[in-house]
């Protein structure tokens, strides 16, 4: 098993629906996960308002989700999916049956875990990290600055 799949397997063992997908290429594999978009298309198109923004992350309120897949179509990164989960449906006061409910599934940065995202914690190669937007913007600025100085003499206008 690849290292990325190992991380997914470890998370799944905790009865957890993986919210990270591995895209395999010929020589490399990469993890694809929700980008927590600033103006999240998935949240904007949800007819029930089930995708909610809370501080630094978006999550799905499963009580509101109807499993319509509109969010799946809207996600520009292909990271939204609809999964079926077993639920108990009450037929009468005395009778219940097991049924399945379709619901949206997306990364919510494991907001319920004090340790942060489970995938980051269990990744055997430490290839997964979480950084906030400000830190990402700072990294981009620094890389651009370095690139400008490294090629500075070569640029003539």
From Swiss-Prot:
Keywords: 4Fe-4S, Iron, Iron-sulfur, Metal-binding, Repeat. GO terms for molecular function: 4 iron, 4 sulfur cluster binding; metal ion binding. [4Fe-4S] cluster 4 binds at residues 46, 65, 68, 71. The keyword 4Fe-4S applies. [4Fe-4S] cluster 1 binds at residue 123. [4Fe-4S] cluster 3 binds at residues 34, 37, 42, 75. Residues 24-55, 56-85, 100-133 form the 4Fe-4S ferredoxin-type domain. [4Fe-4S] cluster 2 binds at residues 107, 110, 119. InterPro entries: 4Fe4S_Fe-S-bd, 4Fe4S_Fe_S_CS, RnfB_subfamily. The keyword 4Fe-4S applies. PANTHER family: ELECTRON TRANSPORT PROTEIN HYDN-RELATED, OXIDOREDUCTASE. This is Frd operon probable iron-sulfur subunit A. It comes from Proteus vulgaris. The lineage of its organism: Bacteria, Pseudomonadati, Pseudomonadota, Gammaproteobacteria, Enterobacterales.
């Amino acid at each position: 098993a690849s290292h990325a799949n190992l991380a997914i397997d470890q998370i799944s063992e905790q009865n957890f629906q993986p919210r990270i997908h591995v895209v395999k290429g010929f020589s490399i594999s990469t993890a694809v996960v929700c980008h927590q978009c600033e103006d999240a298309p998935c949240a904007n198109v949800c007819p029930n308002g089930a995708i909610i923004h809370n501080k630094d992350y978006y999550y799905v309120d499963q009580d509101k989700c109807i499993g319509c897949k509109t969010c799946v179509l809207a996600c520009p990164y292909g990271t939204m999916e609809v999964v079926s989960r077993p639920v108990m449906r009450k037929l009468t006061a005395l009778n219940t049956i097991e049924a399945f409910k379709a619901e949206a599934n997306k990364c919510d940065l494991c907001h319920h875990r004090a340790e942060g995202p489970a995938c980051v914690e269990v990744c055997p190669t430490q290839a997964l990290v979480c950084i906030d937007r400000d830190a990402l913007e700072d990294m981009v600025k620094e890389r651009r600055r370095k690139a400008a100085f490294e090629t500075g003499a070569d640029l003539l206008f």
